[in-house]
Protein backbone atom coordinates (compact mmCIF):
# COMPACT_ATOMS: atom_id res chain seq x y z
CA UNK A 1 0.00 0.00 0.00
CA UNK A 2 2.85 2.32 0.91
CA UNK A 3 4.62 1.51 -2.35
CA UNK A 4 1.49 2.34 -4.34
CA UNK A 5 1.11 5.71 -2.64
CA UNK A 6 4.80 6.38 -3.13
CA UNK A 7 4.55 5.69 -6.84
CA UNK A 8 1.56 8.01 -7.15
CA UNK A 9 3.51 10.66 -5.27
CA UNK A 10 6.49 10.10 -7.56
CA UNK A 11 4.34 10.30 -10.72
CA UNK A 12 2.68 13.50 -9.52
CA UNK A 13 6.06 15.00 -8.68
CA UNK A 14 7.44 14.20 -12.13
CA UNK A 15 4.38 15.74 -13.80
CA UNK A 16 4.74 18.81 -11.59
CA UNK A 17 8.43 19.01 -12.50
CA UNK A 18 7.64 18.86 -16.22
CA UNK A 19 4.97 21.53 -15.84
CA UNK A 20 7.37 23.67 -13.80
CA UNK A 21 10.08 23.34 -16.45
CA UNK A 22 7.63 24.40 -19.18
CA UNK A 23 6.39 27.34 -17.11
CA UNK A 24 9.91 28.36 -16.15
CA UNK A 25 11.31 28.25 -19.67
CA UNK A 26 8.33 29.59 -21.60
CA UNK A 27 5.01 29.88 -19.81
CA UNK A 28 5.27 32.59 -17.17
CA UNK A 29 7.25 35.17 -19.19
CA UNK A 30 5.12 34.50 -22.27
CA UNK A 31 1.83 34.84 -20.39
CA UNK A 32 2.81 38.13 -18.76
CA UNK A 33 4.43 39.65 -21.88
CA UNK A 34 1.42 38.62 -23.97
CA UNK A 35 -0.90 40.41 -21.55
CA UNK A 36 1.26 43.53 -21.67
CA UNK A 37 1.56 43.44 -25.47
CA UNK A 38 -2.19 42.99 -25.87
CA UNK A 39 -2.68 46.24 -23.96
CA UNK A 40 -0.65 48.18 -26.57
CA UNK A 41 -2.40 46.83 -29.66
CA UNK A 42 -4.68 49.31 -31.42
CA UNK A 43 -8.03 47.84 -30.44
CA UNK A 44 -10.96 49.73 -28.96
CA UNK A 45 -10.61 47.82 -25.70
CA UNK A 46 -6.84 48.22 -25.31
CA UNK A 47 -5.15 50.55 -22.85
CA UNK A 48 -3.18 52.20 -25.67
CA UNK A 49 -6.04 52.96 -28.06
CA UNK A 50 -7.52 56.07 -26.41
CA UNK A 51 -4.06 57.50 -25.72
CA UNK A 52 -3.13 56.97 -29.35
CA UNK A 53 -6.31 58.60 -30.69
CA UNK A 54 -5.79 61.65 -28.50
CA UNK A 55 -2.40 62.11 -26.90
CA UNK A 56 -2.89 62.63 -23.15
CA UNK A 57 0.04 65.08 -23.06
CA UNK A 58 1.15 67.57 -25.72
CA UNK A 59 4.40 67.28 -27.58
CA UNK A 60 6.79 70.16 -27.04
CA UNK A 61 7.57 72.08 -30.24
CA UNK A 62 10.49 74.53 -30.08
CA UNK A 63 11.68 77.00 -32.70
CA UNK A 64 15.12 78.63 -32.85
CA UNK A 65 15.84 81.45 -35.31
CA UNK A 66 19.13 82.39 -36.95
CA UNK A 67 18.93 86.14 -36.48
CA UNK A 68 21.16 88.02 -38.93
CA UNK A 69 23.25 90.61 -37.07
CA UNK A 70 25.35 91.97 -39.96
CA UNK A 71 22.87 92.27 -42.83
CA UNK A 72 24.56 95.40 -44.22
CA UNK A 73 27.95 93.71 -44.09
CA UNK A 74 26.65 90.62 -45.92
CA UNK A 75 25.26 92.90 -48.62
CA UNK A 76 28.84 94.12 -49.09
CA UNK A 77 30.38 90.66 -49.20
CA UNK A 78 31.09 89.90 -45.54
CA UNK A 79 30.67 86.43 -44.08
CA UNK A 80 27.41 86.07 -42.10
CA UNK A 81 27.33 86.60 -38.35
CA UNK A 82 24.27 84.91 -36.88
CA UNK A 83 22.67 84.95 -33.45
CA UNK A 84 20.50 82.05 -32.33
CA UNK A 85 17.27 83.29 -30.72
CA UNK A 86 14.98 80.84 -28.96
CA UNK A 87 13.42 78.63 -28.03
CA UNK A 88 9.94 79.85 -28.84
CA UNK A 89 7.98 77.02 -27.26
CA UNK A 90 4.63 75.66 -28.40
CA UNK A 91 2.50 72.87 -27.04
CA UNK A 92 1.59 70.58 -29.91
CA UNK A 93 -1.65 68.69 -29.39
CA UNK A 94 -2.34 65.68 -31.60
CA UNK A 95 -5.65 64.02 -32.32
CA UNK A 96 -6.60 61.30 -34.79
CA UNK A 97 -9.87 60.66 -36.56
CA UNK A 98 -10.28 56.96 -37.27
CA UNK A 99 -11.75 56.35 -40.73
CA UNK A 100 -11.95 52.57 -40.63
CA UNK A 101 -10.07 49.29 -40.64
CA UNK A 102 -8.33 47.46 -43.47
CA UNK A 103 -8.25 43.75 -44.31
CA UNK A 104 -4.60 43.27 -43.35
CA UNK A 105 -4.81 44.26 -39.68
CA UNK A 106 -4.57 47.98 -40.49
CA UNK A 107 -6.28 51.10 -39.22
CA UNK A 108 -6.86 54.19 -41.36
CA UNK A 109 -6.88 57.66 -39.83
CA UNK A 110 -6.40 61.40 -40.28
CA UNK A 111 -3.96 63.30 -38.08
CA UNK A 112 -4.62 66.79 -36.76
CA UNK A 113 -2.05 68.98 -35.00
CA UNK A 114 -2.75 72.10 -32.97
CA UNK A 115 0.03 74.47 -31.88
CA UNK A 116 -0.45 76.67 -28.80
CA UNK A 117 2.22 79.16 -27.74
CA UNK A 118 3.62 78.59 -24.24
CA UNK A 119 4.88 81.94 -22.89
CA UNK A 120 6.10 80.48 -19.60
CA UNK A 121 8.31 77.87 -21.26
CA UNK A 122 9.56 80.52 -23.71
CA UNK A 123 11.20 82.42 -20.82
CA UNK A 124 10.22 85.96 -21.76
CA UNK A 125 10.30 85.54 -25.53
CA UNK A 126 7.05 86.48 -27.26
CA UNK A 127 5.48 85.96 -30.66
CA UNK A 128 5.64 89.73 -31.19
CA UNK A 129 9.44 89.69 -31.17
CA UNK A 130 11.11 90.93 -34.36
CA UNK A 131 13.74 88.82 -36.11
CA UNK A 132 15.90 89.36 -39.18
CA UNK A 133 16.21 86.18 -41.23
CA UNK A 134 16.98 85.09 -44.77
CA UNK A 135 14.07 85.91 -47.11
CA UNK A 136 13.06 82.36 -47.90
CA UNK A 137 10.32 82.95 -50.52
CA UNK A 138 12.36 85.64 -52.29
CA UNK A 139 15.41 83.43 -52.70
CA UNK A 140 13.21 80.45 -53.63
CA UNK A 141 11.58 82.45 -56.43
CA UNK A 142 14.88 83.71 -57.87
CA UNK A 143 16.61 80.31 -57.64
CA UNK A 144 13.67 78.68 -59.42
CA UNK A 145 13.61 81.31 -62.18
CA UNK A 146 17.37 81.12 -62.65
CA UNK A 147 17.08 77.38 -63.16
CA UNK A 148 14.12 77.59 -65.56
CA UNK A 149 14.89 80.81 -67.46
CA UNK A 150 18.15 82.56 -66.46
CA UNK A 151 17.59 85.45 -68.88
CA UNK A 152 14.37 86.42 -67.06
CA UNK A 153 15.92 86.80 -63.61
CA UNK A 154 16.30 90.60 -63.75
CA UNK A 155 12.74 91.09 -65.03
CA UNK A 156 11.25 88.78 -62.41
CA UNK A 157 13.23 90.53 -59.70
CA UNK A 158 11.56 93.83 -60.64
CA UNK A 159 8.21 92.08 -60.20
CA UNK A 160 9.30 90.69 -56.86
CA UNK A 161 10.10 94.22 -55.69
CA UNK A 162 6.34 94.81 -55.89
CA UNK A 163 5.50 91.37 -54.50
CA UNK A 164 7.59 91.97 -51.34
CA UNK A 165 7.43 95.19 -49.38
CA UNK A 166 10.69 97.07 -48.72
CA UNK A 167 12.82 94.64 -50.72
CA UNK A 168 16.23 96.24 -50.22
CA UNK A 169 18.23 93.08 -49.55
CA UNK A 170 17.71 89.31 -49.25
CA UNK A 171 16.54 89.48 -45.62
CA UNK A 172 13.14 89.71 -43.93
CA UNK A 173 12.42 91.81 -40.83
CA UNK A 174 9.33 90.12 -39.43
CA UNK A 175 7.49 89.22 -36.28
CA UNK A 176 7.83 85.66 -35.05
CA UNK A 177 4.09 84.94 -35.17
CA UNK A 178 3.85 86.12 -38.79
CA UNK A 179 6.78 84.04 -39.96
CA UNK A 180 5.63 80.87 -38.20
CA UNK A 181 1.82 80.82 -38.43
CA UNK A 182 -0.04 84.07 -39.19
CA UNK A 183 1.78 84.78 -42.43
CA UNK A 184 3.82 87.52 -44.09
CA UNK A 185 1.70 89.28 -46.72
CA UNK A 186 2.95 89.18 -50.33
CA UNK A 187 1.22 91.57 -52.72
CA UNK A 188 -0.17 90.52 -56.12
CA UNK A 189 -1.98 93.80 -56.78
CA UNK A 190 -0.03 95.48 -59.57
CA UNK A 191 0.07 96.06 -63.32
CA UNK A 192 3.41 94.38 -64.02
CA UNK A 193 3.17 91.45 -66.47
CA UNK A 194 6.01 89.76 -64.59
CA UNK A 195 4.14 90.15 -61.29
CA UNK A 196 1.03 88.66 -62.88
CA UNK A 197 3.16 85.75 -64.09
CA UNK A 198 4.59 85.15 -60.60
CA UNK A 199 1.15 85.23 -58.98
CA UNK A 200 -0.35 83.02 -61.70
CA UNK A 201 2.39 80.48 -61.06
CA UNK A 202 1.56 80.51 -57.36
CA UNK A 203 -2.13 80.08 -58.08
CA UNK A 204 -1.46 77.06 -60.27
CA UNK A 205 1.13 75.40 -58.08
CA UNK A 206 1.82 76.96 -54.71
CA UNK A 207 4.06 75.31 -52.10
CA UNK A 208 2.43 74.42 -48.76
CA UNK A 209 4.05 77.45 -47.11
CA UNK A 210 1.97 79.78 -49.30
CA UNK A 211 -1.76 80.35 -48.84
CA UNK A 212 -4.01 82.77 -50.75
CA UNK A 213 -5.28 85.86 -48.96
CA UNK A 214 -9.00 85.98 -48.18
CA UNK A 215 -11.76 88.61 -48.30
CA UNK A 216 -10.98 89.63 -51.85
CA UNK A 217 -7.40 90.71 -51.13
CA UNK A 218 -5.10 90.02 -54.08
CA UNK A 219 -2.06 88.35 -52.61
CA UNK A 220 -0.60 85.49 -50.61
CA UNK A 221 0.62 84.81 -47.10
CA UNK A 222 3.91 83.07 -46.48
CA UNK A 223 4.40 81.16 -43.22
CA UNK A 224 6.53 78.20 -42.28
CA UNK A 225 4.00 76.10 -40.36
CA UNK A 226 0.49 77.44 -40.91
CA UNK A 227 -0.30 74.50 -43.20
CA UNK A 228 0.41 72.11 -40.30
CA UNK A 229 -1.73 73.94 -37.73
CA UNK A 230 -5.35 72.89 -37.14
CA UNK A 231 -5.49 71.02 -40.41
CA UNK A 232 -5.86 67.30 -40.96
CA UNK A 233 -3.24 65.38 -42.90
CA UNK A 234 -3.56 61.92 -44.36
CA UNK A 235 -5.12 59.51 -44.57
CA UNK A 236 -2.49 57.27 -43.02
CA UNK A 237 -2.88 53.49 -42.98
CA UNK A 238 -1.04 51.80 -40.11
CA UNK A 239 -0.65 48.25 -38.81
CA UNK A 240 -2.67 47.69 -35.62
CA UNK A 241 -0.50 44.88 -34.25
CA UNK A 242 -3.36 42.53 -33.33
CA UNK A 243 -1.99 39.76 -35.56
CA UNK A 244 1.72 40.55 -35.31
CA UNK A 245 2.59 42.87 -32.45
CA UNK A 246 6.12 43.33 -33.81
CA UNK A 247 4.64 45.06 -36.89
CA UNK A 248 2.64 47.51 -34.74
CA UNK A 249 2.75 51.12 -35.96
CA UNK A 250 4.24 50.42 -39.37
CA UNK A 251 2.71 52.75 -41.99
CA UNK A 252 1.69 50.89 -45.14
CA UNK A 253 0.19 53.81 -47.10
CA UNK A 254 -0.14 57.59 -47.04
CA UNK A 255 -2.82 59.48 -48.97
CA UNK A 256 -3.99 56.14 -50.41
CA UNK A 257 -0.53 55.43 -51.88
CA UNK A 258 1.93 52.78 -50.77
CA UNK A 259 4.92 54.89 -51.81
CA UNK A 260 5.76 58.52 -52.50
CA UNK A 261 6.54 59.78 -56.00
CA UNK A 262 9.08 62.53 -55.33
CA UNK A 263 12.27 60.64 -56.03
CA UNK A 264 11.64 58.46 -59.08
CA UNK A 265 13.25 55.46 -57.41
CA UNK A 266 11.70 52.47 -55.66
CA UNK A 267 14.11 52.55 -52.71
CA UNK A 268 13.86 56.27 -51.99
CA UNK A 269 10.09 56.36 -52.61
CA UNK A 270 9.48 53.61 -50.07
CA UNK A 271 7.22 54.37 -47.09
CA UNK A 272 8.95 52.74 -44.16
CA UNK A 273 8.44 52.97 -40.40
CA UNK A 274 5.93 54.56 -38.06
CA UNK A 275 4.67 58.12 -37.61
CA UNK A 276 6.96 58.39 -34.54
CA UNK A 277 4.04 58.23 -32.11
CA UNK A 278 4.02 54.47 -31.61
CA UNK A 279 6.56 51.70 -32.05
CA UNK A 280 6.36 47.91 -31.70
CA UNK A 281 7.94 46.03 -28.80
CA UNK A 282 11.53 44.99 -29.36
CA UNK A 283 12.31 41.31 -29.68
CA UNK A 284 15.33 40.82 -27.41
CA UNK A 285 16.52 38.01 -29.70
CA UNK A 286 16.31 40.19 -32.80
CA UNK A 287 16.95 43.81 -31.82
CA UNK A 288 16.63 46.06 -34.91
CA UNK A 289 19.75 48.00 -35.84
CA UNK A 290 17.63 50.82 -37.30
CA UNK A 291 14.38 52.44 -36.23
CA UNK A 292 12.47 54.04 -39.13
CA UNK A 293 9.93 56.85 -39.14
CA UNK A 294 8.04 58.21 -42.13
CA UNK A 295 8.16 62.02 -42.44
CA UNK A 296 5.52 63.27 -44.92
CA UNK A 297 6.78 66.88 -44.66
CA UNK A 298 10.01 65.81 -46.39
CA UNK A 299 8.50 62.93 -48.43
CA UNK A 300 10.82 60.25 -47.11
CA UNK A 301 11.60 57.86 -44.29
CA UNK A 302 14.47 58.53 -41.92
CA UNK A 303 16.14 56.17 -39.53
CA UNK A 304 17.91 56.30 -36.20
CA UNK A 305 20.62 53.74 -35.50
CA UNK A 306 20.93 51.58 -32.40
CA UNK A 307 23.51 53.06 -30.04
CA UNK A 308 23.08 50.58 -27.20
CA UNK A 309 21.18 50.04 -23.98
CA UNK A 310 20.54 52.84 -21.50
CA UNK A 311 18.68 53.22 -18.20
CA UNK A 312 16.19 56.07 -18.03
CA UNK A 313 13.76 56.68 -15.13
CA UNK A 314 15.02 53.38 -13.63
CA UNK A 315 13.80 51.53 -16.72
CA UNK A 316 16.07 49.60 -19.08
CA UNK A 317 15.69 50.95 -22.63
CA UNK A 318 17.22 50.80 -26.09
CA UNK A 319 18.74 54.08 -27.21
CA UNK A 320 18.63 55.07 -30.89
CA UNK A 321 20.11 58.19 -32.45
CA UNK A 322 20.44 59.58 -35.95
CA UNK A 323 23.74 58.67 -37.56
CA UNK A 324 25.79 60.32 -40.28
CA UNK A 325 24.73 57.67 -42.81
CA UNK A 326 21.08 58.81 -42.76
CA UNK A 327 21.91 62.13 -44.47
CA UNK A 328 25.24 61.09 -45.97
CA UNK A 329 26.40 62.05 -49.43
CA UNK A 330 26.19 59.40 -52.14
CA UNK A 331 29.93 58.74 -51.86
CA UNK A 332 29.57 57.89 -48.16
CA UNK A 333 26.25 56.06 -48.50
CA UNK A 334 25.39 54.87 -52.04
CA UNK A 335 21.80 54.15 -50.91
CA UNK A 336 21.25 57.93 -50.81
CA UNK A 337 22.10 58.37 -54.50
CA UNK A 338 18.44 58.34 -55.50
CA UNK A 339 17.82 61.47 -53.41
CA UNK A 340 19.97 63.44 -55.87
CA UNK A 341 17.80 65.58 -58.17
CA UNK A 342 18.68 68.13 -60.85
CA UNK A 343 17.08 71.25 -59.49
CA UNK A 344 19.54 74.09 -60.02
CA UNK A 345 21.26 73.72 -63.37
CA UNK A 346 21.83 71.20 -66.13
CA UNK A 347 25.45 70.81 -65.02
CA UNK A 348 24.53 70.01 -61.39
CA UNK A 349 23.59 66.43 -60.53
CA UNK A 350 21.54 67.53 -57.51
CA UNK A 351 23.74 65.59 -55.09
CA UNK A 352 24.55 67.76 -52.11
CA UNK A 353 27.28 67.79 -49.52
CA UNK A 354 27.37 65.51 -46.50
CA UNK A 355 24.56 66.12 -44.01
CA UNK A 356 22.12 68.15 -46.12
CA UNK A 357 19.00 67.09 -47.95
CA UNK A 358 17.18 68.57 -50.94
CA UNK A 359 13.48 69.37 -50.34
CA UNK A 360 12.75 70.67 -53.85
CA UNK A 361 11.21 67.42 -55.16
CA UNK A 362 8.95 67.26 -52.12
CA UNK A 363 8.00 70.88 -51.39
CA UNK A 364 8.29 72.41 -54.84
CA UNK A 365 10.73 75.02 -53.53
CA UNK A 366 14.55 74.89 -53.42
CA UNK A 367 14.78 74.45 -49.66
CA UNK A 368 17.50 72.38 -48.03
CA UNK A 369 17.10 70.41 -44.81
CA UNK A 370 19.81 69.50 -42.33
CA UNK A 371 20.32 68.84 -38.67
CA UNK A 372 20.62 71.99 -36.51
CA UNK A 373 23.80 74.01 -36.97
CA UNK A 374 24.79 71.54 -39.72
CA UNK A 375 25.50 68.83 -37.15
CA UNK A 376 26.98 65.74 -38.91
CA UNK A 377 27.34 67.82 -42.09
CA UNK A 378 30.37 68.74 -44.16
CA UNK A 379 32.86 71.12 -42.53
CA UNK A 380 32.77 73.09 -45.77
CA UNK A 381 29.32 74.42 -44.85
CA UNK A 382 30.62 75.90 -41.59
CA UNK A 383 33.41 77.84 -43.30
CA UNK A 384 30.81 80.16 -44.83
CA UNK A 385 30.01 81.78 -41.46
CA UNK A 386 31.99 84.22 -39.39
CA UNK A 387 30.10 83.28 -36.22
CA UNK A 388 26.84 81.85 -34.91
CA UNK A 389 26.86 78.31 -36.31
CA UNK A 390 28.28 75.80 -33.83
CA UNK A 391 27.19 72.15 -34.08
CA UNK A 392 26.88 70.35 -30.76
CA UNK A 393 25.76 66.72 -30.42
CA UNK A 394 24.03 67.26 -27.07
CA UNK A 395 21.99 70.20 -28.38
CA UNK A 396 21.41 69.15 -31.99
CA UNK A 397 21.15 65.36 -32.06
CA UNK A 398 17.95 63.41 -32.82
CA UNK A 399 17.32 60.44 -30.54
CA UNK A 400 14.77 58.21 -28.83
CA UNK A 401 14.65 55.93 -25.79
CA UNK A 402 12.42 52.88 -26.41
CA UNK A 403 11.03 50.50 -23.81
CA UNK A 404 11.61 47.02 -25.30
CA UNK A 405 8.62 45.42 -23.53
CA UNK A 406 5.95 47.81 -24.83
CA UNK A 407 7.66 49.84 -27.56
CA UNK A 408 6.64 52.99 -25.70
CA UNK A 409 8.85 56.08 -26.08
CA UNK A 410 10.17 57.25 -22.71
CA UNK A 411 11.91 60.25 -24.21
CA UNK A 412 12.43 61.36 -27.76
CA UNK A 413 13.53 64.42 -29.69
CA UNK A 414 13.42 65.11 -33.43
CA UNK A 415 15.35 68.13 -34.74
CA UNK A 416 15.48 69.63 -38.21
CA UNK A 417 16.87 72.81 -39.76
CA UNK A 418 15.59 74.65 -42.84
CA UNK A 419 18.09 76.35 -45.15
CA UNK A 420 18.19 77.98 -48.56
CA UNK A 421 21.03 79.05 -50.80
CA UNK A 422 21.99 82.70 -50.72
CA UNK A 423 23.42 83.10 -54.22
CA UNK A 424 25.36 85.96 -55.73
CA UNK A 425 23.52 87.16 -58.87
CA UNK A 426 25.23 90.08 -60.63
CA UNK A 427 22.04 91.16 -62.45
CA UNK A 428 20.03 91.43 -59.24
CA UNK A 429 20.78 94.59 -57.19
CA UNK A 430 19.92 92.91 -53.89
CA UNK A 431 22.36 90.05 -54.58
CA UNK A 432 25.21 91.69 -56.49
CA UNK A 433 27.74 91.54 -53.67
CA UNK A 434 26.51 88.85 -51.28
CA UNK A 435 28.69 85.77 -50.71
CA UNK A 436 27.23 82.51 -52.01
CA UNK A 437 26.50 79.82 -49.44
CA UNK A 438 23.87 77.72 -47.73
CA UNK A 439 22.00 80.00 -45.32
CA UNK A 440 19.95 78.72 -42.35
CA UNK A 441 16.64 80.33 -41.41
CA UNK A 442 15.50 78.38 -38.35
CA UNK A 443 15.55 74.99 -36.73
CA UNK A 444 12.87 73.10 -34.86
CA UNK A 445 12.76 70.58 -32.05
CA UNK A 446 9.78 68.29 -31.54
CA UNK A 447 9.82 66.00 -28.55
CA UNK A 448 8.20 64.53 -25.48
CA UNK A 449 9.15 63.09 -22.13
CA UNK A 450 7.00 60.49 -20.40
CA UNK A 451 5.15 61.92 -17.39
CA UNK A 452 5.90 60.57 -13.89
CA UNK A 453 2.49 58.84 -13.75
CA UNK A 454 3.13 56.98 -17.00
CA UNK A 455 6.67 56.19 -15.88
CA UNK A 456 5.22 54.49 -12.80
CA UNK A 457 2.76 52.51 -14.93
CA UNK A 458 5.66 51.28 -17.01
CA UNK A 459 7.75 50.41 -13.96
CA UNK A 460 4.79 48.44 -12.60
CA UNK A 461 4.62 46.46 -15.85
CA UNK A 462 8.33 45.72 -15.63
CA UNK A 463 7.92 44.73 -11.97
CA UNK A 464 5.20 42.28 -12.96
CA UNK A 465 7.61 40.66 -15.41
CA UNK A 466 10.30 40.53 -12.72
CA UNK A 467 7.90 38.85 -10.30
CA UNK A 468 7.03 36.34 -13.00
CA UNK A 469 10.72 35.64 -13.53
CA UNK A 470 11.20 35.10 -9.79
CA UNK A 471 8.07 32.97 -9.47
CA UNK A 472 9.11 30.62 -12.25
CA UNK A 473 12.43 29.86 -10.56
CA UNK A 474 10.77 29.36 -7.18
CA UNK A 475 8.26 26.94 -8.70
CA UNK A 476 11.02 25.14 -10.59
CA UNK A 477 13.13 24.81 -7.43
CA UNK A 478 10.12 23.53 -5.47
CA UNK A 479 9.37 20.99 -8.21
CA UNK A 480 12.96 19.73 -8.21
CA UNK A 481 13.00 19.37 -4.41
CA UNK A 482 9.64 17.60 -4.50
CA UNK A 483 10.88 15.26 -7.23
CA UNK A 484 13.98 14.39 -5.17
CA UNK A 485 11.87 13.66 -2.10
CA UNK A 486 9.50 11.54 -4.22
CA UNK A 487 12.43 9.60 -5.68
CA UNK A 488 13.83 8.85 -2.23
CA UNK A 489 10.38 7.84 -0.97
CA UNK A 490 9.83 5.46 -3.87
CA UNK A 491 13.31 4.04 -3.48
CA UNK A 492 12.75 3.38 0.20
CA UNK A 493 9.36 1.82 -0.31
CA UNK A 494 10.66 -0.54 -3.00
CA UNK A 495 13.91 -1.35 -1.14
CA UNK A 496 16.09 0.07 -3.91
CA UNK A 497 18.13 1.43 -1.04
CA UNK A 498 18.84 -0.78 1.96
CA UNK A 499 17.13 0.98 4.78
CA UNK A 500 17.75 -0.46 8.29
CA UNK A 501 14.60 -1.33 10.13
CA UNK A 502 13.59 0.63 13.17
CA UNK A 503 16.29 3.19 12.66
CA UNK A 504 16.04 6.91 12.32
CA UNK A 505 18.07 8.97 9.90
CA UNK A 506 20.97 9.24 12.31
CA UNK A 507 21.10 5.49 12.95
CA UNK A 508 20.95 4.92 9.20
CA UNK A 509 24.24 6.76 8.85
CA UNK A 510 26.14 5.74 11.97
CA UNK A 511 24.33 2.62 13.08
CA UNK A 512 26.32 -0.03 11.18
CA UNK A 513 29.60 1.50 12.28
CA UNK A 514 28.57 1.45 15.95
CA UNK A 515 27.26 -2.10 15.72
CA UNK A 516 30.52 -3.31 14.22
CA UNK A 517 32.46 -1.80 17.09
CA UNK A 518 30.17 -3.36 19.64
CA UNK A 519 30.97 -6.74 18.23
From Swiss-Prot:
Single Gene Ontology BP annotation:
sensory perception of smell
Tissue distribution: Localizes to both male and female antennae but not the leg, wing, gut, head or thoracic ganglia. Detected throughout the sensory epithelium, associating with both sex-pheromone sensilla and plant-volatile sensilla. Differentially expressed among different sensilla and different neurons within a given sensillum.
What is the protein name stated in its UniProt record? Sensory neuron membrane protein 2
Q: Which residues lie on this side of the membrane: Cytoplasmic?
A: 1-7, 491-519
Keywords on record: Cell membrane, Disulfide bond, Glycoprotein, Membrane, Olfaction, Receptor, Sensory transduction, Transmembrane, Transmembrane helix
Q: Where are the transmembrane segments?
A: 8-28, 470-490
Question: What pairs make up the disulfide bonds?
Answer: 268-338, 299-362, 340-351
Pfam families assigned to the protein according to its UniProt record, in alphabetical order: CD36
Q: What is the lineage of its organism?
A: Eukaryota, Metazoa, Ecdysozoa, Arthropoda, Hexapoda
Residues glycosylated per entry:
44, 67, 104, 166, 229, 272, 314
Those parts of the protein on the Extracellular side are: 29-469
